[in-house]
Each structure stands twice: as C-alpha cells, then as structure tokens.
C-alpha cells in the first residue's frame, strides 16, 4: 500500500503550483534529477516524466472544460507525475492514469493524495504488453511521442483499447517526431487538429491537440 510518509522519506521534492479554471493544484516534482539518470547512458530512459510539460497543462485545461459523464471511461497513458489525470478527476471525470516508470508512479500517487484524489486509479502500463481491462471512451496523452520504436505499440494500444466511436487526444508541442507519427495515424484514424497557444511576457508556445477517431 502506498504511504505518503514513506514517499517523503524516499524522495527529495519541490512543489509547483498550477491554476486551472480558478482551482489551484500543488504538484510534487523531483528536486534533483541525477538519481534518475544513468551516468553511462544519459539519453536512455531520461526522466522526461519529471517535469510538467506545457502540453500537459493545455490538456488539463481541455479536460477541465469538458463536460463530465459518469458513464464514460477515460484513460491517460504516460501520465508522468499525474497532473492531467488529477485535474480530470477533480472536475468530475472517471479516469484511470497509467505510467510505466516506477518513480513516476510514486510521484503520481503522492500528488493524487495531496490534491484530494486518493481514489484515482493509478496503474503501471507497458505499451508493448498492455494489460488493460475493457475499452475506453476517451484516451488521452501529452508529450508521449519521441521515439520511433514507440509508434507501432502506441497505434496497437489505441486500436485495441478505444471503444467504437471513441476518441483519442494527443497533446504535444510541434516537433518532427509528431509529424512522422501523424503520417502513420492517417491510414487508420480520422484526425482533427486543434492548436492552442500559451503566452507569457517573454514567449509564446504552440501546443497541438490531435483529436482522432478510428475510421469505419
């Protein structure tokens, strides 16, 4: 059983605050990354989960604005430290969060407890060998498209686990890997693209939401 006390004993953390639809969320992040990096191969399994990506912030806001339906099941893959699923659950969605990295899962569980979502289902999921029960009305993910070797497992997972007529939403900043995967998706999915721009005093970042449904 997960223990918040044991979590604090195991990890050094810092807290980031996010405000979504006037509601504050306090999210624990690793204070240092060195313990999660292999010094002999820094690019292998780099802890991409250990920060809140702008795409995750945009996806969280999208789900907060989406009318919840208790009869619909949502699934998040590659959930990292848990922001998206925590926001979705807070705004009434029935969502299951999944992640593969064990440390990320611990942070997600801690964040769920801190943000009054102790009953949020948080599960380990290997995209290459998924063990999900049933199908989902909506599958969401943010910034999961980096490695070409993940493309085929992702497509198989989506096709196997989205309900007929269900939707998949992928959020990411614009990069080449996303464009490559977009080309692969087009043969199996109808795709609608929504662009969101996050602006600050110093810059602007465009985040793309790929909204996809399996072709008939």
Where are these regions (language model features)?
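S-adenosylmethionine-dependent methyltransferases
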Residues: 1-216
């Amino acid at each position: 059983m997960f223990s918040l006390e044991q979590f604090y004993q195991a990890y050094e953390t810092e807290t980031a605050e996010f405000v979504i639809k006037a509601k504050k969320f306090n999210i624990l992040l690793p204070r240092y990354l060195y313990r999660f990096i292999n010094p002999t191969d820094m690019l292998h399994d780099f802890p991409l989960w250990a920060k809140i990506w702008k795409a995750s912030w945009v996806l969280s806001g999208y789900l907060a604005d989406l009318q919840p339906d208790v009869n619909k099941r949502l699934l998040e893959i590659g959930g990292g430290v848990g922001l998206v699923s925590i926001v979705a659950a807070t705004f009434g969605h029935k969502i299951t969060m999944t992640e593969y990295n064990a440390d990320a899962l611990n942070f997600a569980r801690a964040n769920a407890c801190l943000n009054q979502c102790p009953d949020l289902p948080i599960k380990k999921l290997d995209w290459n060998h998924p063990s999900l029960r049933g199908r989902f009305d909506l599958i969401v993910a943010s910034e999961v498209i980096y490695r070409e070797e993940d493309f085929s497992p992702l497509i198989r997972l989506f096709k196997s686990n989205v309900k007929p007529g269900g939707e998949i939403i992928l959020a990411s900043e614009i990069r080449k890997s996303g464009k490559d995967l977009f080309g692969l998706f087009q043969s199996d999915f109808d795709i609608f693209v929504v662009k969101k721009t996050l602006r600050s005093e110093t810059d602007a970042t465009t985040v793309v939401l790929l909204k996809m449904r399996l072709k008939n």
